[in-house]
Amino acid sequence: MSTENLPQSPEQPPRKPRVAVVFGGRSSEHGISVVTAGAVLRAIDRTKYDVLPIGITRDGRWALTADEPERMAITDRRTPSVEELAESNEGGVILPVDPANREVVYSEPGSVPKALGEVDVVFPVLHGPYGEDGTLQGLLELSGVPYVGAGVLASAVGQDKEYMKRVFTSFGLKVGPYVVIRPREWERDESAARRKIVDFAGEHGWPLFVKPARAGSSIGITKVDDLAGLDEAVAEAQRHDPKIIVEALLRGREIECGVLEFEDGPRASVPAEIPPAQSHAYYDFEAKYIDSTPGIVPAPLTPEETAEVRRLAVEAFEATSCEGLVRADFFLTEDGDFVINEINTMPGFTPISMYPQMWQASGIAYPELVDRLVEAALRRSTGLR
């Protein structure tokens, strides 16, 4: 489906496609999702699209929010919330449940539901669980509403660091050493689970990185230099996800590459390099979004290295059956190998984020990037494909 073949009324001028920008959510990345939505709302072409902002509160309520992107920015080192933007503390937005009817409804207790009109495409800019992990995508598939980005399977795989690495390995992509501690392992025998990590450290050395298995934006990650810090690091990761993954330190350069789906298939951007953090132990949430640690775009690589990382980024996109967009993160080791760390199916998408910067350097400015993603979603059908 494209903007040219939307149903039209003979009495009215052609209507513009309606884009619902959905943001916020129940994950730890709620605030940065709001910031991302503000950037999309500022950039989207209002002469081409009608826009409906829908925020999901931290407790999961779908709220009609003010279309005021200027209020959706980081201020005083603090990210905004949907609760601050919601037009009501009680009302809720209801998606269509009939694929033949894409009308969205707004309902408040004790009031007659109000029709908000049809939605032609959803632009979900949620990060983390309950938004980027296939749950929202499944809801939209059931509703028959096209949406930007990866489908159910790719979103689920792209959110779980363990299964992502398993898929990469099965397709011949190199991954670093890791060990997974599942919730039942820790609950059943903490000592045995701890020994599993200590044995891993004995094989691969300290430091280790202890991470929530299904979180992003570097939230909940701790660099652990020795056994003394392990329990605290595990507790911090488990605050965000009962399943954790522990990774060995890979010595090398951090290289990122964006992938964007075109009509003739996915293409990779110029790569970027994340320089070693000066005031941070690693490239964490504060470095990414608060202190805005700049990346180097394009990355200072040889032509051969650039071609190889772009090829591998597209291969990772294809291996996980992604759609729309992906940011692929690699380490370029001292041996000259590219080791894939992870993909992000909805990467940081503010104008200062690496994904838009890489495409800016590749010739696609932020507003055009938003437009290409919406157009790709409109062309795509829901259901099996």
UniProtKB/Swiss-Prot annotation:
What the entry lists under InterPro entries is as follows: ATP-grasp, ATP_grasp_subdomain_1, D-Ala_lig_Van_CS, D_ala_D_ala, Dala_Dala_lig_C, Dala_Dala_lig_N, PreATP-grasp_dom_sf
> Which parts of the chain are coiled coil?
none
Spell out the GO cellular component terms annotated for this protein, sorted alphabetically and separated by semicolons.
cytosol
Q: What is its main location?
A: cytoplasm
Enumerate the residues binding ATP. Answer: 201-256
Q: Please give the cofactor(s) recorded in the UniProt entry for this protein.
A: Mg(2+); Mn(2+)
Q: Which GO terms describe its molecular function?
A: ATP binding; D-alanine-D-alanine ligase activity; metal ion binding
> EC annotation?
6.3.2.4
The record's section on Gene3D superfamilies has: 3.40.50.20, ATP-grasp fold, A domain, ATP-grasp fold, B domain
All residue ranges annotated as the ATP-grasp domain in the record: 165-375
Q: Which residues bind Mg(2+) 2?
A: E342, N344
Residue positions annotated to bind Mg(2+) 1 are D329, E342
Question: What's its catalytic activity?
Answer: 2 D-alanine + ATP = D-alanyl-D-alanine + ADP + phosphate + H(+)
Q: Which SUPFAM superfamilies match?
A: Glutathione synthetase ATP-binding domain-like, PreATP-grasp domain
| Annotated keywords | ATP-binding, Cell shape, Cell wall biogenesis/degradation, Cytoplasm, Ligase, Magnesium, Manganese, Metal-binding, Nucleotide-binding, Peptidoglycan synthesis
Q: Where in the cell is it found?
A: Cytoplasm
Q: Which GO terms describe its biological process?
A: cell wall organization; peptidoglycan biosynthetic process; regulation of cell shape
Biological pathway:
Cell wall biogenesis; peptidoglycan biosynthesis
Cofactor binding, note field: Binds 2 magnesium or manganese ions per subunit.
Give the similarity note: Belongs to the D-alanine--D-alanine ligase family.
Q: Which HAMAP family match?
A: Dala_Dala_lig
Q: What PANTHER family does this protein map onto?
A: D-ALANINE--D-ALANINE LIGASE, D-ALANINE--D-ALANINE LIGASE A
Q: Which NCBIfam families match?
A: D_ala_D_alaTIGR, PRK01966.1-4
Q: What is the name listed in the Swiss-Prot or TrEMBL entry for this protein?
A: D-alanine--D-alanine ligase
| Gene (name only) | ddl
